[in-house]
């Protein structure tokens, strides 16, 4: 016998609802009234928390400029003295040392893991597209620099300047002739194939010329070749990491490990685990970056003896360089990115704001590389096997800012000396600047070292480089920002290309090595999911799959 459920008392329901509704209504009314205020506060708080590091870094740059100008107004370097100035710059020096400490393991391990995660055919396509992008953007930057310099005529505004910063130039370097373009090309090839990998971590090869009667000390390790009765060619190893040779070796070594098949999987996992641990160190260093950047910028401004007179004398040249970098970085590169990806380029730029500010503070593409890798992966969604393969290459060969600055400087020096540039000389400047920027080291003032090649190519006096050195502390920072921005946009474009073409990659297995992956014992050669084996499902899609080892030949 079915029992009817008890009926609810309508009065009780009415009473309960009358008791509850006012309270509920009051909460809704209160939340509606306070939602606009509290909700906006919460959004602002979350936004600040998510972008705290970016805001701190940008604020550090602004504070560094203000602090430097304030100390300069109070007497500057003369009032501080050499000892106090060194202590004043110590926090910035510490940041540079921390970043440079990370470069070597990061470049080698990331490139080995990235090259091992792509098939050789995919590796070739990605590398070819990257080099094409870097070449096109460098040519565009060079053309923009020449066009702006011809339009603004910065050299015509400079009068009665003979040696604004002679103290910066080494007196021994003034009398030495400049090496030829062929010597620079041969040095580039020598650095691609280092004779010693250990020494390549801190030394690179360079050719120079010295007079026979030069009183400057010549290192005993240099190979001397007599050119004529007055000149000697020196083949020496100079201080500075040979990052180009390390990049080439790491890529080739990664390809070789992939060709080994399962035998090389343990070593691939080792390099990927090493790289992941290095990125943890990078995340810690990033929180010290604002402090170091503040003192790097401030100390560099304090070192300049007369900033005001410098800007008055070379203001048009500085404006030409900074305007060119701004146009290329805020219009040209974002436009290329938008045309190929149909994504908002300025949202991409906001994601790499911390590395850009770090590049301005450190003035080194190589030192910014660890932070750039972390930001493009976490903020902009670039896959690890793309960023860790492309960004080290870009830090070596992609120098948009250097190419633009060199073209502006060449036209500036030509106008300063009253030399007219015809069409052939302009093309020579474009081609030489693009080619020489590839070999420019990713170190502070690396572009100035290759500027002499361009001046020699169009028969302009090399001695006027001393004018460029006077303001290089500012222009070189702008160059570095543009260089690393071009690297990041290149990684973003290649990520879009890989997504569209569905390029095969073993990245999830090889790059993202998690703790749950068992390293001992190693998976058998027939284990499912081995990225170095090709799996063929049976006709019915069952588990009876066959595996075939990838050929080493």
Curated annotation (Swiss-Prot):
Signal peptide interval: none
SUPFAM superfamilies: Proton glutamate symport protein
Residues on Cytoplasmic side: 1-50, 116-129, 261-269, 341-345, 377-385, 495-553
Residues engaged in binding Na(+) 1: 394, 398, 483, 487
Tissue expression as described in the entry: Highly expressed in adipose tissue. Detected in lung, skeletal muscle, large intestine, kidney and testis. Expressed in lung, brain, kidney and neural retina (at protein level). Expressed in Mueller cells (at protein level).
Reported consequences of knocking out the gene: Mice are born at the expected Mendelian rate and have normal lifespans without obvious abnormalities. They show a moderate decrease of hematopoietic progenitor numbers under steady state. Constitutive or conditional SLC1A5 deletion confers resistance to hematological malignancies.
InterPro entries attached to this UniProt entry: DAACS, Na-dicarboxylate_symporter, Na-dicarboxylate_symporter_CS, Na:dicarbo_symporter_sf
Family designation: Belongs to the dicarboxylate/amino acid:cation symporter (DAACS) (TC 2.A.23) family. SLC1A5 subfamily.
Record's subunit section: Homotrimer.
Known role: Sodium-coupled antiporter of neutral amino acids. In a tri-substrate transport cycle, exchanges neutral amino acids between the extracellular and intracellular compartments, coupled to the inward cotransport of at least one sodium ion. The preferred substrate is the essential amino acid L-glutamine, a precursor for biosynthesis of proteins, nucleotides and amine sugars as well as an alternative fuel for mitochondrial oxidative phosphorylation. Exchanges L-glutamine with other neutral amino acids such as L-serine, L-threonine and L-asparagine in a bidirectional way.
Record-given protein name: Neutral amino acid transporter B(0)
């Amino acid at each position: 016998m079915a029992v009817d459920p008890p009926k609810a008392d309508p009065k009780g329901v009415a009473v309960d609802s009358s008791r509850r509704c006012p309270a509920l209504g009051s909460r809704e009314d209160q939340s509606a009234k306070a939602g606009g205020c509290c909700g906006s506060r919460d959004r602002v708080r979350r936004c600040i928390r998510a972008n705290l590091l970016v805001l701190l870094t940008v604020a550090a740059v602004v504070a560094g400029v203000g602090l430097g100008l304030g100390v300069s107004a109070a007497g500057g370097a003369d009032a501080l003295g050499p000892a106090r100035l060194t202590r004043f710059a110590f926090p910035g020096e510490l940041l540079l040392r921390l970043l440079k400490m990370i470069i070597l393991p990061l470049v080698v391990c990331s490139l080995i893991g990235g090259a091992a995660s792509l098939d050789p055919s995919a590796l070739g396509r990605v590398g070819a597209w990257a080099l094409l992008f870097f070449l096109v953007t460098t040519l565009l930057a060079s053309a923009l620099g020449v066009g702006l310099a011809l339009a603004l005529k910065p050299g015509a505004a400079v009068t009665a300047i003979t040696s604004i910063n002679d103290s910066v130039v080494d007196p021994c370097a003034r009398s030495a002739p400049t090496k030829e373009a062929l010597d620079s090309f041969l040095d580039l090839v020598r650095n691609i194939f280092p004779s010693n990998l250990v020494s390549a971590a801190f030394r690179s090869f360079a050719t120079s010329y010295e007079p026979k009667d030069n009183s400057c000390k010549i290192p005993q390790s240099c190979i001397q070749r007599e050119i004529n009765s007055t000149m000697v060619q020196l083949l020496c190893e100079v201080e500075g990491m040979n990052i180009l040779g390390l990049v080439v070796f790491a890529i080739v070594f990664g390809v070789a490990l992939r060709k080994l098949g399962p035998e090389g999987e343990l070593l691939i996992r080792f390099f990927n685990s090493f790289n992941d641990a290095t990125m943890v160190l990078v995340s810690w260093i990033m929180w010290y970056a604002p402090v170091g950047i503040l003192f790097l910028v401030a100390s560099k401004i304090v070192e300049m003896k007369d900033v005001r007179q410098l800007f008055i004398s070379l203001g048009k040249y500085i404006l030409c360089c900074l305007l060119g970098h701004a146009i290329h970085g805020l219009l040209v590169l974002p436009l290329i990115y938008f045309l190929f990806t149909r994504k908002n380029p300025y949202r991409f730029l906001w994601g790499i704001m911390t590395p850009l500010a770090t590049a301005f503070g450190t003035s080194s593409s190589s030192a910014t590389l660890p932070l750039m890798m972390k930001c493009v992966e976490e903020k902009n969604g670039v896959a690890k096997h793309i960023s860790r393969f492309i960004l080290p290459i870009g830090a070596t060969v992609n120098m948009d800012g250097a190419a633009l600055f060199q073209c502006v400087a060449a036209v500036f020096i030509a106008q300063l000396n009253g030399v007219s540039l015809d069409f052939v000389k302009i093309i020579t400047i474009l081609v030489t600047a693009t080619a020489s920027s590839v070999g420019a080291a990713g170190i502070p003032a690396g572009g100035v070292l290759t500027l002499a090649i361009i001046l020699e190519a169009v028969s302009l006096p090399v001695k006027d480089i001393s004018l460029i050195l006077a303001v290089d502390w500012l222009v070189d920072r702008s160059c570095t920002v543009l260089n690393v921005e071009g690297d990041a946009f290149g990684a973003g474009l290649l990520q879009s290309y890989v997504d569209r073409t569905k390029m095969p990659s073993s990245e999830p297995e090889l790059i993202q090595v998690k703790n749950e992956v068992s390293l001992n014992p190693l998976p058998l050669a027939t284990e499912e999911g081995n990225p170095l084996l090709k799996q063929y499902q049976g006709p019915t899609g069952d588990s009876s799959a066959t595996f075939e080892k990838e050929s080493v030949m």
